[in-house]
Swiss-Prot record:
Superkingdom in the source lineage: Bacteria
Enzyme kind, highest EC tier: transferase
Cellular localisation: Cytoplasm
Enzyme Commission numbers on file: 2.1.1.172
UniProt entry keywords in alphabetical sequence: Cytoplasm, Methyltransferase, rRNA processing, S-adenosyl-L-methionine, Transferase
Function, as annotated: Specifically methylates the guanine in position 1207 of 16S rRNA in the 30S particle.
Subunit description: Monomer.
Catalytic activity: guanosine(1207) in 16S rRNA + S-adenosyl-L-methionine = N(2)-methylguanosine(1207) in 16S rRNA + S-adenosyl-L-homocysteine + H(+)
Organism listed in the record: Shewanella woodyi (strain ATCC 51908 / MS32)
Name under which the protein is recorded: Ribosomal RNA small subunit methyltransferase C
Gene assigned in the entry: rsmC
């Protein structure tokens, strides 16, 4: 099943006849594979690891799949580049720069997105190395714009797209590096502050789930540099931000993509997280429950599980099911800190 933006791209597949096409910020469907009915070759760059996994079993000589913040070959060029307009508007500028770097001279840019997602902003955001975007199609509550590369685009520099700032935490001052598209308040958010203020001393091998820009991992290493921390996230920009944060503070940790806990290996002494499950929707709540279950399976006997969650979210029954009891370490009018031991009676 194709998303609405993907259906609009497929409707305009004549744009890609016999072309070498790059798709940036792919959605979680099989549009890249279906594009091969008109295009000669398709390359994808997914920023969401789950979306990458959806396509991963369909790779072929003419369908090359990548996950990350950039392509491995910075000099590779394409006849056309498709951008799925991102939810974070600031990320659009980065993707446009990336598209310009990888387009051949006079190559075509296609930008697609939902009306309510801000895709109309592309007209104002387009860099001067592209011509004025043309609204080619409008269907399924989506818009599709085309533009042409009119002059050589600058090579992308991460330093142009990262925001570095000092952050005070209960463990001390840290330098945080945020790439565009990664959540940041430029201050310690209330939930993370409550979590870091009430943490027990952790044991050797620690998993930071949904690491984001690496605030929690860096704070832990500031207090306990002996920890062996693994940082996982589903978002490529977050993972690179985390790497930059660790480097800026002279810390070392293993940083990698994982869909849930599926890509983690072995068992952990502690799992810590400010998980990105805040809206209370059933689909999100189901993911949160899966996280509790997977955590219990990934902890060593006696291992600790420490998370902060919006106090209205229904964690308690699931925690009790898999950990045997519910231990609220601290709470305020917005958040609860759950701190549980596996096999704890």
């Amino acid at each position: 099943m194709l998303t609405n933006p993907s259906q609009l791209i497929l409707k305009n597949s004549d744009l890609f006849t016999s072309q070498n096409v790059l798709v940036l910020n792919c959605e979680g469907d099989l549009l890249p594979k279906q594009l091969l009915e008109s295009a000669s070759c398709v390359t994808t760059l997914s920023l969401d690891f789950h979306h990458h996994l959806v396509m991963s079993q369909h790779s072929s000589p003419n369908l090359t799949l990548h996950f990350g913040h950039q392509l491995p070959n910075a000099d590779q060029t394409f006849d056309s580049v498709i951008i799925y307009y991102p939810k974070a508007k600031a990320l659009a500028g980065y993707l446009l720069n990336l598209a310009g770097q990888h387009l051949k001279a006079e190559g075509e840019l296609i930008v697609v997105g939902e009306n309510k997602g801000g895709v109309k902003s592309i007209v104002k955001q387009i860099p001067d190395y592209f011509d004025t975007p043309f609204k080619r199609d409008n269907a399924r509550h989506c818009l599709l714009f085309t533009s042409q590369l009119t002059q050589k685009a600058p090579s992308i520099k991460l330093s142009d797209w990262v925001n570095s700032y000092q952050l005070d935490t209960p463990q001390g001052e840290l330098t945080i590096c945020n790439l565009v598209g990664v959540f940041s308040e430029k201050r310690l958010d209330e939930g993370t502050k409550l979590l870091l203020s009430h943490l027990p001393r952790l044991s050797r091998r620690v998993l930071d789930f949904g690491c984001g820009a690496g605030v929690i991992a860096a704070a832990l290493l500031k207090a306990q540099p002996e920890l062996e921390i693994e940082c996982v996230d589903i978002n490529a920009m977050a993972l690179k931000s985390c790497e930059l944060t660790l480097e800026a503070n002279n810390f070392t940790a293993k940083v990698y993509a994982s869909d849930g806990l599926s890509q983690t290996q072995g068992h952990f002494d502690d799992i810590i997280s400010n998980p990105p499950f805040h809206d209370g929707l059933k689909s999100t709540t189901d993911i949160a429950k899966s996280f509790v279950k997977e955590s219990a399976q990934k902890l060593k006997s006696g291992g600790g599980w420490h998370i902060v969650a919006n106090r209205h979210l229904p964690y308690s029954d699931t925690i009790n099911e898999f950990f045997g009891q519910v231990n609220v370490l601290a709470e305020n009018n917005k958040y609860k800190i759950y701190s549980n031991k596996i096999n704890q009676k």
